[in-house]
């Protein structure tokens, strides 16, 4: 499936923001979906990590938010890891502000799941808003957020080890695939040829 890159991410978030408010009680779903997609992308989360976040795993700090990942695919023993997501200058696309807004309207018991959805729902929500944004929803999956982060970070010249620190990859093999994708046009030999 295709990674979600910055321009597509912005289109998807705008589609969420523009969604009609006519259905009473659905406003919090809109806040959830925006926070889910922005946090998923910004943190390079796996779907399973994203849906397992509990309220007690979140700590808002002056710089942004710290999210504890208690267990993941590459951490079956449950050592845990903390992902730090800073505030973005662009408030419309800031994952920290989106998460705060959602929590303000949805706070529950500390032991409960923040997003309260299945990992399959992540893909369904993403596909739905991709279509609303005029994109081909069939080209995206829940993993598109994670691969989108890694590919975008590589496009912006972020070092391999820093991408791995955020995504939790233990080996460079997968991260290098994202970097290769990001560099298809950037380092293309045809850029040097003038016709």
Question: Whereabouts are the PLM-identified features?
Answer:
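Extended, non-catalytic subsegments within catalytic or DNA/protein-binding/adaptor domains
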Residues: 1-195
